[in-house]
Structure formats: structure tokens, C-alpha cells
């Protein structure tokens, strides 16, 4: 039986990088294991739900909802049992999940608003991870959430502008404008010299637009860019 696993590489980066940043800043603890496993299985569980809504038939995907949903509940319950306030992170994710379900039902899950909702959903993993490691909620959890959100919203803009919206000049201008502001927004939210983590994102949005590259090449470059972002942010938050 072939596992039903999402194939979006960008989503995997959004799943991992904010969580890792939160763990690096907060300090790794044993409770990060169930939290990460719960986070991972939650991501996997959303995929069959999305397909069921998109194709308007749930039966082919019910077993995968159970396979992924059961461990999701178990691992996240362990995390919440250890730190009950984490339940509020889950509550805050509900509107974002409903936005995703709405666009999946309309077979328009590539809409920019849905992308932004997805980015905020994933970046909350860094918020929870930092909170869990530090033991208290402080500005660093918000910092990791905001910086990760800025980065991955930019990635969504860029990828959409060179693939699905490559012939949409207006969308290109929106992407260029966002990436022009991106380093300044990062600094505004407290990044200091770590705004440098966003420079490659801005440069590739301006100079790589219009290149007739295969999707695989674009994906590889995005992974490299995400690794650079992770490295710079790790240096900044551990200084």
C-alpha cells in the first residue's frame, strides 16, 4: 500500500524551518519530540482532508484521515498535557484551517490568500516550539513566527509569479514590491543584521523573474534559499 504523502517541497520547508528555529532559540527538550511528531502528522492528516473536499468524495481518503489523525491527536495531547497553554495555539489555527478548507472545496487551493493562510499555519509551529523550549512566552516566539512568515510569504509570491502567474505582469509587480520591502520589514520586526537573510530572496525575485526554468530547478533554488535563511537566523538568535 503506497502512503498518501504531500509532494509540495515548499510545504515541507515551512513545516521544518520555523519549528527548528523555535527549538534552537528555546533550547531542545524531550517534549519537542511529541510536539514535532504531532505537528508532522497534523500536516499529513490535512492532505487527505484536502483531497476529499477537492474531489467531493471522502471514502477513498477516510483510512488516511484515520492513519494520520490518530497519532496527531495522541502526540499533541501529550504536548498539551505537559504545557496546557499550547491549546491556544491550536485554537488560533482553526480560522486558518477553515480558510484552507474553503479554497479546497472550491478547487482553488493555489489562491494567494490560501497560501498566506498556509504560511501562517506552518509558522505557528516555530511559535509553539520556542514557547515549549523556553518555558515562557516572550518576544522571541513572536520574532520567529514573524520572520518565518515574511520569508515564506515571499517564497509564495515568487514561485507563483514564475509558474502559475508568469504571464501576469500585475502579479509580478506585486511580487517585486513585496520583495523590495522585505528586508526593511524584517529589520522593522527586530531582525537587526539578520535582515541579510532576506537579501537572496529579494535578488532572485527581481533578477530571476522571466527565466524559463523547469519547476524542479525553481524548487531546488528555493530549498537552497530556505537553508540560507535558516542558517542566518540561527546565527542571529544564538548570538
From Swiss-Prot:
Record carries keyword Lyase: no
Location of the protein in the cell: Cell membrane
GO CC field: plasma membrane
Transmembrane intervals: 4-24, 29-49, 61-81, 84-104, 116-136, 139-159, 180-200, 218-238
Entry keyword annotation includes Transmembrane helix: yes
Coiled-coil zones: none
Keywords carried by this UniProt record: Cell membrane, Membrane, Transmembrane, Transmembrane helix
Main location, first listed in the record: membrane
Membrane topology: Multi-pass membrane protein
InterPro entries in UniProt: YwiC
Stated family: To H.influenzae HI_1626.
Protein name: Uncharacterized protein YwiC
Protein's gene: ywiC
Amino acid at each position: 500500500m503506497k502512503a498518501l504523502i504531500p509532494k509540495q517541497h515548499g510545504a515541507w520547508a515551512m513545516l521544518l524551518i520555523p519549528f527548528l528555529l523555535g527549538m534552537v532559540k528555546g533550547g531542545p527538550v524531550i517534549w519537542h519530540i511529541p510536539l514535532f511528531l504531532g505537528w508532522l502528522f497534523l500536516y499529513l492528516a490535512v492532505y487527505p482532508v484536502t483531497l476529499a473536499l477537492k474531489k467531493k468524495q471522502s471514502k477513498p481518503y477516510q483510512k488516511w484521515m484515520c492513519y494520520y489523525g490518530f497519532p496527531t491527536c495522541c502526540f499533541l495531547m501529550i504536548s498539551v498535557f505537559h504545557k496546557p497553554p499550547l491549546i491556544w495555539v491550536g485554537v488560533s489555527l482553526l480560522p486558518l484551517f477553515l480558510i484552507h478548507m474553503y479554497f479546497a472545496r472550491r478547487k482553488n487551493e493555489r489562491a494567494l490568500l490560501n497560501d498566506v493562510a498556509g504560511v501562517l499555519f506552518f509558522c505557528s509551529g516555530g511559535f509553539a516550539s520556542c514557547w515549549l523550549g523556553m518555558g515562557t512566552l516572550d518576544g522571541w516566539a513572536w520574532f520567529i513566527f514573524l520572520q518565518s512568515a515574511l520569508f515564506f510569504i515571499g517564497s509564495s509570491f515568487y514561485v507563483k509569479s514564475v509558474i502559475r502567474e508568469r504571464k501576469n505582469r500585475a502579479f509580478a509587480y506585486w511580487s517585486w514590491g513585496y520583495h523590495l520591502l522585505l528586508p526593511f520589514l524584517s529589520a522593522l520586526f527586530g531582525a537587526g543584521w539578520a535582515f541579510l537573510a532576506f537579501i537572496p530572496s529579494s535578488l532572485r525575485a527581481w533578477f530571476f523573474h522571466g527565466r524559463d526554468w523547469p519547476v524542479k530547478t525553481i524548487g531546488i533554488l528555493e530549498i537552497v534559499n530556505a537553508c540560507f535563511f535558516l542558517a542566518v537566523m540561527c546565527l542571529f538568535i544564538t548570538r
